[in-house]
């Protein structure tokens, strides 16, 4: 996730890199950690490896995400989908809904918003046969936490887990922040 300092000063170890490299970077970290454990350089323990990416990062980082799925790394890919490249002023992504207005898909006499259907990333990840795939909405936090706990268990025991959330962006969606829960639920 690309944010400015100090908002990335988390209280856990993290790597902040280009958003298209998340799955490749985390795959390498997982493999390096596993080798260190095999050589007894790190004690065995419970560590959860999580990649956080937006739908734009999954668009341009899809190759490395599919590679991580192929290798079935014990990690979680968490995608928050707000329907566009929001860090660049709401350019359309493959997750932008059909007909939506963005800075690169206009509405008017000659243009009708985004002209093609969105990519179904959960279905794409399901086609890789990874152990766990779930979709959640930020408007339902109990379901979100339940599925996140399950993703952690699957990542630890079986391999790659993919979790996608529909996430609101009031600024670029043109909604009021207090209406986002009802917008997501709709």
Model-assigned labels for residue ranges:
Residues 10-17, 58, 83, 90:
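Flexible, active-site-adjacent loop/turn segments at secondary-structure boundaries
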Residues 1-47:
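Thiamine diphosphate
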Residues 39-50, 60-76, 80-186:
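Glycine-rich ThDP/TPP pyrophosphate-binding loop and its adjacent helix/strand module
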Residues 54-56:
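Active-site metal-binding loops of divalent metal-dependent hydrolases
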């Amino acid at each position: 996730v690309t944010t400015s300092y100090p908002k990335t000063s988390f209280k856990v170890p993290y790597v902040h890199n280009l958003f298209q490299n998340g799955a490749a970077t985390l795959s390498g970290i997982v493999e390096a950690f596993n080798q260190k454990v095999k050589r007894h350089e790190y004690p065995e323990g419970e560590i959860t490896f999580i990649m956080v990416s937006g739908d734009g990062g999954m668009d341009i980082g899809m190759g490395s995400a599919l590679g991580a799925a192929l290798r079935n790394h014990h990690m979680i890919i968490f995608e928050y989908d707000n329907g566009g490249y929001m860090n660049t002023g709401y350019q359309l992504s493959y997750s932008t809904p059909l007909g939506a207005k963005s800075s690169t898909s206009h509405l008017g006499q000659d243009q009708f918003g985004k002209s093609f259907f969105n990519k179904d990333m959960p279905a794409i990840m399901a086609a890789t046969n990874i152990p766990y795939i779930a979709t959640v909405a930020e408007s339902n936090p109990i379901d979100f936490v339940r599925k996140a706990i399950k993703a952690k268990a699957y990542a630890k025991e079986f391999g790659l887990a993919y979790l996608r959330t529909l996430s609101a962006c009031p600024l670029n969606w043109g909604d009021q922040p207090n209406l986002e829960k009802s917008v997501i639920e709709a």
